[in-house]
């Protein structure tokens, strides 16, 4: 029994296997193939402390396509909202379900859930990591760039957030060059140190830069909202600090015509990205969103096999 709290815990070949399974699931889905449910009658619990569109619905769809039922719940709907401990809650859920996908404010909550669980715990987003998003990002880049290894991608904006961190981690596992483009006060140099062993094995490279011109020649330009959930009190300061890092048509021109545009969504149009980019010919955000479903199927299949 394994968990998916962060891709840091996975070896490069394991990440690649999950992505190959994702591509296979997608190929069969697009071909209209109706395949025998892998886990008929099983239950997956979606425990969400935060709102969600793509993560909640992609996990629900993925579970259904594998023959499982997903039940969505929040702290206010469980006794955990009235003081029952996480440990006791997880011991009970372990008797009913085969997995719990949890979206939480603090990554430590996920760790406590996993420590007290006899079923798989999946990170559906925490303040530090978003591994499900990173897997969908990798599948999308693979599809459009035509290769899985050696990809060059620039994440522009809040380079300290969970999406940027998980992109860097999966990039290190797959031998990518990940350019984290944002203000110096958001640089997390410890992340590069933590990934040094994987980078040495795969030949990847991760570096921080505050120059928007460093998007030149990449395969993909990626951004995310400037004010993530939980940082609303810092909204104005973050907008001021990140305004020079808006992904607009000029940035895409620097990147080059072959570069694709990625965004994990939801987008705050007019802030981190302009309409002409997200709706433009280089944007692949809707395919990227669909890929959340296919990679979720692969994660379920990999963990529950």
UniProtKB/Swiss-Prot annotation:
One Pfam family this sequence matches: OTCace_N
Native source species: Pyrobaculum islandicum (strain DSM 4184 / JCM 9189 / GEO3)
Binding site for carbamoyl phosphate: 52-55, 79, 103, 130-133, 264-265, 292
Pathway where this protein functions: Amino-acid biosynthesis; L-arginine biosynthesis; L-arginine from L-ornithine and carbamoyl phosphate: step 1/3
Primary site of residence: cytoplasm
Annotated GO biological process: arginine biosynthetic process via ornithine; citrulline biosynthetic process; L-arginine biosynthetic process
E.C. code: 2.1.3.3
Residues reported in the UniProt entry to bind L-ornithine: 162, 224, 228-229
Molecular function in Gene Ontology: amino acid binding; ornithine carbamoyltransferase activity
Classification via SUPFAM superfamilies: Aspartate/ornithine carbamoyltransferase (SSF53671)
Key words, A-Z: Amino-acid biosynthesis, Arginine biosynthesis, Cytoplasm, Transferase
Gene Ontology, cellular component aspect: cytoplasm
Family: Belongs to the aspartate/ornithine carbamoyltransferase superfamily. OTCase family.
Protein location: Cytoplasm
Superkingdom of origin: Archaea
Cited function: Reversibly catalyzes the transfer of the carbamoyl group from carbamoyl phosphate (CP) to the N(epsilon) atom of ornithine (ORN) to produce L-citrulline.
Catalytic activity from the UniProt record: carbamoyl phosphate + L-ornithine = L-citrulline + phosphate + H(+)
Name the record gives this protein: Ornithine carbamoyltransferase
Source species taxonomy: Archaea, Thermoproteota, Thermoprotei, Thermoproteales, Thermoproteaceae
């Amino acid at each position: 029994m394994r968990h998916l709290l962060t891709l840091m815990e996975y070896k490069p070949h394991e990440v690649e296997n999950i992505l190959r399974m994702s591509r296979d699931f997608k190929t069969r889905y697009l071909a209209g193939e109706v395949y025998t449910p892998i886990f008929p009658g099983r239950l997956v619990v979606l425990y969400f402390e935060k709102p969600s569109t793509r993560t909640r619905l992609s996990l629900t769809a993925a579970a259904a396509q594998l023959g499982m039922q997903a039940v969505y719940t929040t702290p206010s709907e469980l006794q955990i909202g009235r003081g029952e401990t996480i440990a006791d809650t997880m011991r009970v859920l372990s008797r009913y379900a085969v997995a719990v996908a949890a979206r939480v404010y603090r990554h430590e909550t996920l760790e406590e859930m996993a420590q007290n669980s006899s079923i798989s715990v999946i990170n559906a987003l925490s303040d530090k990591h978003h591994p499900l998003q990173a897997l969908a990002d990798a599948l999308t880049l693979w599809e459009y760039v035509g290769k899985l290894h050696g990809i060059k991608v620039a994440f522009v904006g809040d380079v300290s957030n969970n999406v940027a961190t998980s992109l860097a981690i999966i990039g290190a596992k797959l031998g990518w060059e990940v350019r984290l483009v944002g203000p110096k006060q958001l640089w997390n140099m410890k992340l590069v140190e933590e990934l040094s062993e994987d980078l040495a094995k795969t030949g990847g490279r991760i570096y921080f830069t505050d120059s928007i011109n460093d998007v030149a020649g990449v395969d993909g330009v990626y951004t995310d909202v400037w004010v993530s959930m939980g940082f609303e009190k810092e909204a104005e300061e973050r907008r001021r600090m990140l305004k020079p890092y808006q992904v607009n048509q000029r940035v895409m021109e620097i990147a080059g015509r072959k570069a694709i545009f990625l965004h994990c969504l939801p987008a705050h149009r007019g802030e981190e990205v302009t309409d002409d980019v997200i709706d433009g010919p280089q944007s692949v955000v809707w395919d990227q969103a669909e890929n959340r479903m296919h990679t979720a199927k692969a994660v379920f299949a990999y963990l529950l096999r």
